[in-house]
């Protein structure tokens, strides 16, 4: 089946998860897990898969929805069987252009938007995806504490941030998008960077080392990952089609920060703001240009500019129906070859 290899690559083996969470301090009995669907689905936009999608028959066309739901089953089972934690799982997806950010930066998320064009070369997959997302939305209504949320024209990362902002528990974001690495700056929040057996649980302590892993340069001083959300406006971000500031890449910026720390000219990381870092770095970058990039790259800044109505809209699809018979009937009728793992999805559920 064409969907399984990609989906299974996002299910980290329990053995590796055990290493990640062996000394993990949980702040409550609840864990929020946010799954960036665009990050996963981007792997299906490949020309070598087009013929495979065209050859799908019957119920094979809707197998993607059950495979995605089983990602939730995988992580729910892990956190309950290994750590006795109740999980709330949120799939989130960019269904509309992030208009506010595109006004400031017209090419923002351009590649994501173009590949979703129903009339383009990925027309077959987009039609399959449309049906599967509709089914995923339906399934999530009947599975306890699993939700499918749409961005509806907002920056997609605001969807998980809105929920994080209203709950005191551990938050784990499953993503491959460097834009979202900034989530490590927020309380009790971690990024699970998915990459088969090389997957990494990112936090404030290891983020800077991780983004420099392919570079020869290594800082002499500890650099807190909290800085990432402040330097992101300077950096390129392929996932969002952000070109960054020429000549001001991550190595150059972190080198400068490292030198300032050595010379005792750098403040506490917690005391930094966008403006103070801009002055300290003194990189000969136009303030208005970098500030405009900050307004579309900093998640907390964007969130603070939302109205109450906007925040309510972000929660529109938080629906629970809890009808066991309905979900069992759907499973036995449509997903015989790729069943939804219902037993795992009910692990540790609290009513």
Model-derived regions, located:
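Extended two-metal-dependent nuclease catalytic cores across DNA- and RNA-processing enzymes
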Residues: 2-18, 85-86, 110-317, 321, ...
């Amino acid at each position: 089946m064409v969907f399984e290899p990609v989906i299974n690559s996002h299910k980290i083996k329990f053995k590796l998860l055990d290493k990640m969470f062996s000394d993990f301090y949980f702040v409550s009995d609840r864990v929020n897990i946010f799954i960036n669907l665009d990050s996963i689905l981007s792997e299906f936009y490949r020309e070598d898969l087009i013929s495979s999608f065209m050859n799908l028959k019957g119920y094979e066309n809707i197998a993607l929805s059950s495979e995605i739901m089983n990602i939730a089953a995988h992580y729910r089972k892990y956190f309950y069987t290994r750590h006795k934690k109740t999980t709330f799982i949120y799939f989130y997806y960019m269904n509309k252009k992030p208009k506010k950010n595109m006004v400031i930066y017209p090419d923002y998320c351009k590649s994501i938007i173009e590949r979703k064009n129903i009339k383009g070369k990925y027309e077959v997959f987009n039609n399959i995806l449309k049906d599967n997302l509709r089914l995923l939305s339906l399934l999530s209504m009947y599975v306890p504490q699993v939700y499918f949320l749409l961005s509806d024209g907002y920056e997609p990362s605001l969807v998980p941030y809105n929920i994080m902002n209203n709950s005191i528990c551990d938050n784990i974001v499953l993503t491959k998008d460097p834009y979202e690495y900034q989530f490590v700056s927020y309380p009790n929040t971690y990024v699970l960077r998915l990459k088969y057996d090389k997957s990494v649980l990112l936090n404030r302590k290891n983020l800077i080392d991780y983004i420099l892993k392919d570079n020869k340069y290594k800082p002499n001083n500890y650099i807190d990952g909290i800085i990432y959300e402040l330097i992101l406006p300077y950096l390129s971000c392929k996932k969002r089609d952000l070109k960054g500031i020429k000549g001001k890449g991550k190595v150059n910026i972190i080198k400068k920060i490292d030198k300032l720390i050595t010379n005792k000219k750098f403040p506490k990381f917690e005391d930094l703001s966008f403006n103070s870092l801009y002055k300290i770095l003194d990189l000969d970058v136009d303030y208005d240009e970098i500030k405009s990039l900050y307004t579309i790259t900093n998640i907390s800044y964007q969130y603070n500019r939302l109205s109450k109505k906007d925040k309510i809209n972000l929660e529109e699809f938080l629906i629970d129906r809890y009808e066991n018979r309905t979900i069992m009937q759907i499973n036995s009728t449509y997903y015989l070859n790729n069943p939804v793992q219902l037993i795992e999805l009910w692990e540790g559920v609290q009513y």
